[in-house]
Regions:
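Cytosolic regulatory regions of ion transport systems
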Residues: 1-165
Length: 165
């Protein structure tokens, strides 16, 4: 996750990571970070989950993700959650459990590579971003892939947000 993106918008963030070196580097960079495994009881409390407005889970480990969500909801039922997954099946399961956003990490990586390739061929940023966004919402393999039993959804980029500056 890109902690600096939140800091540049003056949004509070606390990172929990089980990699001690990464935690130290984050702290050295001014990012509040806690060393530990968020799927272990007590860690989310230490991170202030009770005051959180959003839980972002970036681990690709499905069982760990489910456990983190379970623990977080014990502390703060209804917490908005965004998660990284490794499969469409996991996306479907997490969405059925009320997760706000579940994305397949490898797919989002491929979108980033495709965007770079489009830029490299001289496609404008506006057209490249539109092409990538169209892939996301078209059902052609995006995080927002529509299953037959579900209505079409909008990608977060298309949802109404606070007015742009």
């Amino acid at each position: 996750m890109r902690a600096r993106a939140f800091q540049t918008q003056d949004l509070p963030i606390i990172v929990v990571d089980k990699d001690r070196r990464r935690v130290e580097a984050l702290r050295d960079g001014g990012v509040p970070a806690i060393y530990g495994d968020a799927s272990t009881p007590g860690i989310l409390e230490a991170a202030g989950m009770g005051r959180a407005r959003l839980l972002v889970i970036a681990t690709p480990e499905g069982l760990r993700t489910r456990r983190i969500i379970e623990l977080a909801r014990l502390i703060k039922p209804g917490i908005d959650t965004a998660v990284r997954t490794q499969s469409d099946a996991e996306v479907a399961y997490l969405e059925s459990q009320g997760v706000g956003l579940a994305i397949v990490g490898a797919r989002e990586l491929s979108f980033g590579l495709a965007r770079y390739a489009l830029f490299s061929f001289g496609v404008s940023a506006k057209r490249a971003n539109a092409a990538i966004q169209n892939e996301r919402i078209s059902g052609a393999g995006g995080a927002f892939e529509r299953r037959p039993d579900q209505p079409a959804r909008e990608a977060p980029e298309l949802r109404r947000h606070a007015d742009d500056d």
